[in-house]
Amino acid sequence: MAEFIKLPVGIENFEKIRRDGFYYVDKTGLIEQLLNNWGEVNLFTRPRRFGKTLNMSMLKCFFEIGTDQSLFEGLYISKNKALCDAYMGKYPVISISLKGVNADSYENARSLLKRIVMEEAKMHRIIMSGNRLDDIDKAEYMSLVTGDMGEDTLVYSMKTLTALLEKYYEKKVIVLIDEYDVPLAKANENGYYDQMVLLVRNLFENVLKTNSSLKFAVLTGCLRVAKESIFTGLNNFKTNSILDEEYDETFGLSLIHI
């Protein structure tokens, strides 16, 4: 009797899919396209169930320092040895999803956003070891981990984390933001849109604009929020939607996969 490959229904974690032998539609060509079609800030908008979150998980696994390179064996990107040697496992990565910022008030939404930053900061606690960071740096890091930050600190939190990671690793930082538009959509539904736009715009501007610690960033979402709303003044900002041919094979499924 033929052995069937398991389908990863509802699984959006690249490492789990590869380790547990689930069927994986190879989208690692996205890595090559991102690096060849360089943009410092890259926004991808696609409908739900188009593999955005899985692609972000895959990008994190590829670039992050300490990655298990065997996860990519046999996949398209592994054929590009020069690219893999230069980029695989070579960068600190900040990876957050804003999917959970779903609240009925601005105060609750802000608290949820703070929690997301706290949890991501905890993932990088290794930077507290050794003496690469001074006492001031470590105090800044602890404020992120403990959530001891007002709104003025929150809007600089991701930029602060990139600076700390760059100082520790002596490498520029890759930033991945999944479901970037959820806080804005929920704010619009619940009557605090203007406040949320200001918070998200300040957060994004600080981490994505004139940030010397940033290597590049990728954002994904379902909605194309007007650039004037939250991406004001960003240079080298690229957007790609379902209507664009570029990257059309790296999101969703084609007929040969169905």
Regions found by a protein language model. Name each.
Residues 160-166, 195-215:
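Substrate-engagement module of ASCE P-loop NTPases
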Residues 61-126:
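P-loop NTPase motor core
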Residues 1-80:
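Walker A/P-loop-proximal flanking segment of P-loop NTPase domains
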Residues 10-14, 18, 101, 108, ...:
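Conserved P-loop NTPase mechanochemical-coupling segment
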Residues 176-178, 215-222:
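Structural recognition of the conserved hydrophobic beta-strand(s) that form the central parallel beta-sheet
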Residues 256-258:
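Conserved small/polar residues in nucleotide/adenosyl-binding loops
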Residues 212, 225-243:
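Short regulatory helix/loop adjacent to the ATP-binding pocket of P-loop NTPases
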Residues 169-193:
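Conserved P-loop NTPase "ATPase switch" module shared by AAA+ and STAND
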